[in-house]
A protein has these predicted regions:
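Non-catalytic pre-domain segments flanking phosphatase-related domains
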Residues: 1-20
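Mg2+-dependent phosphoryl-transfer enzymes with acidic/Ser/Thr/Gly-rich catalytic loops
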Residues: 8, 13, 33, 174, ...
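Short, well-ordered beta-strand core segments
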Residues: 18, 43, 50, 73, ...
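Active-site phosphate-binding/coordination module
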Residues: 29-126
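Short, structured coil segments at secondary-structure junctions
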Residues: 68-69, 77, 160, 220-221, ...
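Conserved acidic, metal-coordinating active-site core of Asp-based
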Residues: 110-220
Length: 264
């Protein structure tokens, strides 16, 4: 991982969009600071596409799509995307894949199994807002659990046939062949006519993240950036970002904003 200051200057002028995780990338200790929100606003005002790509639930994403200075949002680790149509005064929601008919019953049963088997974890406080996935809290509203406990949660989800990803606060599991990257690719193609397979296209986007569930995005985008706390995960990252900020969490995102806008 190179320091963000090594980002080539030509990236700034060619850039058309910024994709970003939310928890511990935009937020700091669970709060969205004024500076981080203002950074989003500045990027959007500069004419860049701004799209959060998050593990947070549908209920939150509806609010984000409507009220934040963004061009859309990918939620629940790729289960759907949302985009607000101001003229029509509605939020367009596109779900990815066909969920199993008994999904909710399976999610409920697995949640009970995990909560019994892994002491100290809890159902995420935002689970009631979710449509497609199961979120187990290992760090947000509970005393942080050791790595072995997090791994045990992942194993149980995978044994149940789920895909499982670790964020900075939750372990998320879902039934379906999608993730943050696959849904981002589809959203950009269908909503903005952007093919990330076109020559040079992915170099026109920056992704900012902080944790293992961002690894597909880190590995795909050549100009991926980790805020400094990404280093806390060490070798648990399947792919690491190309660049890393000096600041942690929201301060790191502000740093990315400053660097990108300085060159435009």
């Amino acid at each position: 991982m190179h320091p963000l200051s090594d980002l080539p200057t030509h990236v700034h002028s060619n850039l058309i969009g910024v994709l970003t995780d939310i928890d511990d990338t935009l937020t700091t200790e669970g709060r969205l600071t004024a500076a981080a929100y203002a950074a989003l606003e500045r990027l959007h005002a500069a004419g860049l596409k701004v799209i959060p790509v998050t593990g947070r639930p549908a209920g939150w994403c509806d609010h984000i799509a409507r009220m934040w200075p963004v061009d859309g949002v990918v939620g629940e680790n790729g289960a759907f995307w949302m985009r607000h149509d101001a003229r029509a005064k509605k939020v367009k929601t596109v779900f990815v894949g066909q969920p199993p008919a008994d999904r909710q019953a399976r999610l409920d049963a697995l949640a009970k199994e995990i909560l019994t088997a892994v002491p100290g974890c809890a159902l995420a406080s935002d689970q009631f807002c979710r449509i497609a996935d199961l979120a187990i809290d290992y760090c947000e509203d509970v005393v942080p659990l050791p790595t072995a406990a997090v791994d045990a949660i992942v194993r149980r989800m995978e044994a149940a046939g789920m895909r499982a990803k670790v964020s900075s606060i939750h372990v998320n599991g879902w039934f379906g062949d999608y993730d943050k990257l696959s849904t981002t690719r589809r959203m950009l193609a269908e909503e903005f006519g952007v093919s990330l397979d076109a020559p040079g296209e992915r170099a026109r986007w920056v992704f900012v993240g902080d944790s293992p569930n961002d690894a597909p995005m880190f590995g795909f985008f050549q100009h991926s950036v980790g805020v400094a706390n990404v280093k806390d995960f060490g070798d648990r990252l399947a792919a690491k970002p190309a660049y890393v900020t000096q600041g942690r969490a929201g301060a790191g995102f502000v740093e990315v904003c400053e660097v990108l806008l300085a060159g435009r």
